[in-house]
Amino acid sequence: VGGKLICMASGGAALNPKLERIFLCAGLKVLQGYGLTETCVVVSVNRFGEDNIRIGSVGPVIDGVQVKIAEEDGEILVKGPSVMLGYYKNPEATAEVMDKEGWFHTGDVGTFVEGRFLKITDRKKEIFKTSAGKYIAPLAIENKLKECRFIEQCMVVGEGQKFASALLVPNFANFKDYCKGSGIEWKSNTEMASHEDLKRLINEHVKQANRSLAPYEQLKRCEILNAEWSIDGGELTPKLSLKRKVIKEKY
């Protein structure tokens, strides 16, 4: 990048905290931020200096912008001169996201860490309720699962069920390296997805992740799949976000 780069801003999708630490330890200032088209992009962003950055957060709110967390559902609400007046010639859509007090409803759920660092926990529409009436935010759990080098993609499910479960797509490249070092003959991805070593490695990580979750959030069952999700396959959007409804129907 020319040797003159001072810092980079990361947005659009969550940056894995583990990866964020690696960047910072390597001297690469990758500062995670948050915003939407409707807010003229930036709402909050991490800054230089230890007092202005928190790993796992999207930083302090920028000057001139107000942010509050809705008491009833934790939705992030934004207000300020950078927030849009409304969608062009679409008052119905505008009314769905702008309230009478001028707060824009982002559709994202979050909280403040230490009173000033905004942290995104999930998308409001992706939160589901179990049969016991407990609400589960899948994104936070999925990010914990993807810290395992043998898990490439995952989706937490459980709406209307007694407990949460997960669909897991292995990182076949990393498992192939493991097999090579362990003297295990590599076959096809389909066959290796059911290999006992892969099941053991993934289950160990799931157990570790469960220890940091509330009892009602803990995964009771995981299904390891034999093919990656893709845009062409219809499971991912062009931004590589999960098409949850499609995946749920497919599996």
Annotate the PLM regions.
Residues 1-52, 152:
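Gly/Ser/Thr-rich phosphate-binding loop
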Residues 35-39, 106, 130, 237-239:
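Ser/Thr-glycine-rich phosphate-binding loops at phosphate-binding pockets of nucleotides
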Residues 153-155, 203-251:
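Conserved C-terminal "lid"/linker of ANL adenylate-forming enzymes
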